[in-house]
A protein has these predicted regions:
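Alpha-helix capping and helix-coil boundary motifs
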Residues: 2, 25-27, 95
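Histidine/acidic-rich helix-loop-helix segments that form or flank divalent-metal centers
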Residues: 2-9, 109
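Alpha-helical structural motif
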Residues: 6-10, 14, 96
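Membrane-targeting and insertion segments and their boundary/processing signals
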Residues: 12-16, 71-74
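Short helix-loop boundary/capping segments at the starts of domains
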Residues: 19, 23, 45-55, 73, ...
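Alpha-helical phosphate/pyrophosphate-handling elements in metalloenzyme active cores
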Residues: 30-68, 101-109
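Divalent metal-dependent catalytic cores for phosphoryl transfer on phosphate-bearing substrates
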Residues: 62-109
Length: 109
């Protein structure tokens, strides 16, 4: 599988995963969509940086893949965090990074 298709596959999984947290309640869903959009913007920024770095020969494709996946999944724990505690505050809930690690281990995207 080529690198672009691999990242697109992860993006598709991410979209389906996030959709599971939508409830139909506009106020709740606005918070979920905020984090979805944020994660995709971070991925877009990472794509621009990675593209330049790979073209310049300062980043290999393995590192590029890691950077893109890190960008996409950096807030993956936020969705469970918000569903359970209705907050994105780690201080008022749980560490979203650790929660995200659990999500990725359980889901294996």
């Amino acid at each position: 599988m080529d690198a672009q298709r691999d990242i697109f596959r992860h993006e598709a999984w991410f979209g389906q995963y996030v959709d599971r947290f939508l409830t139909g309640d506009a106020a709740h869903d606005a918070h979920i969509e905020l984090k979805r959009e944020h994660s995709l913007l971070v991925l877009g920024n990472a794509r621009a940086i990675v593209s330049e770095a790979v073209a310049a020969g300062t980043m290999d494709v393995v590192s590029a893949r890691a950077a893109l996946l890190g960008a996409l999944y950096h807030d993956i724990g936020r969705f469970r965090q918000y569903r359970r505690w209705q907050t994105f505050s780690d201080a008022r809930s749980t560490n979203h990074g650790l929660l995200g690690g659990r999500v990725l281990n359980e889901e294996r995207p």
